[in-house]
């Protein structure tokens, strides 16, 4: 099945707009390419809790100054990957900020609102990683809250330390 089909334009340096079917900008791990994965699959948070592809429009801005950061945000149809035959009245949104305070550091903060049926779901995610020549240390926390107390709130934590063996 087709996962992504989108067009991306770069009207000015460090700014882009994307329209089409794509992964929603959310979590620290969801946008890693397969060759950048640390395990056989994505983390639990990226795969099970924050794994959303949808049809929509996003914008991203990269700042490369003294305190570099990347801001991404988008509006989405809300029907998800498998049900694109109808347009929902409520648009979903996602906002993601990657703060790059030092050469080897990444702090990611993101929020997402989806409404797959009649229940609104708000998710908040915070992650941090440190990468040097051999070590990758990462931790991520996600809080998922269902509207009208439809389900209990979800707390998910993912953390790991990876050591690369030289070949």
Indicate residue ranges for each PLM-predicted region:
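A short, flexible beta-alpha/helix-coil linker loop
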Residues: 78-81, 144-146
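Outer-membrane beta-barrel and related beta-rich outer-membrane complex signature
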Residues: 29-33, 83-85, 121, 151
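Residue-level detector of functional hotspots within protein domains
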Residues: 3, 41-45, 83, 121-125, ...
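Outer membrane beta-barrel
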Residues: 1-78, 89-91, 98-106, 160-163
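Detector for outer-membrane/organellar transmembrane beta-barrel domains
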Residues: 68, 88, 98-167
């Amino acid at each position: 099945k087709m996962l992504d089909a989108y067009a991306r334009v770069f009207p000015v340096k460090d700014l882009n707009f994307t329209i089409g079917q794509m992964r929603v900008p959310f979590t620290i791990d969801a946008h890693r390419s397969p060759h950048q994965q640390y395990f056989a699959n994505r983390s639990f948070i990226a795969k099970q809790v924050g794994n959303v592809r949808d049809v929509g429009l996003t914008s991203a801005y990269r700042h490369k100054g003294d305190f570099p950061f990347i801001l991404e945000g988008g509006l989405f149809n809300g029907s998800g990957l498998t049900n694109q035959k109808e347009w929902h009245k409520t648009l979903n949104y996602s906002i993601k900020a990657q703060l790059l305070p030092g050469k080897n550091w990444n702090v990611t903060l993101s929020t997402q609102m989806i409404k797959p049926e009649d229940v609104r779901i708000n998710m908040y995610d915070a992650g941090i990683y440190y990468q040097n020549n051999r070590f990758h240390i990462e931790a991520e926390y996600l809080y998922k809250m269902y509207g009208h107390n439809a389900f209990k709130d979800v707390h998910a934590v993912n953390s790991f330390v990876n050591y690369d063996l030289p070949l």
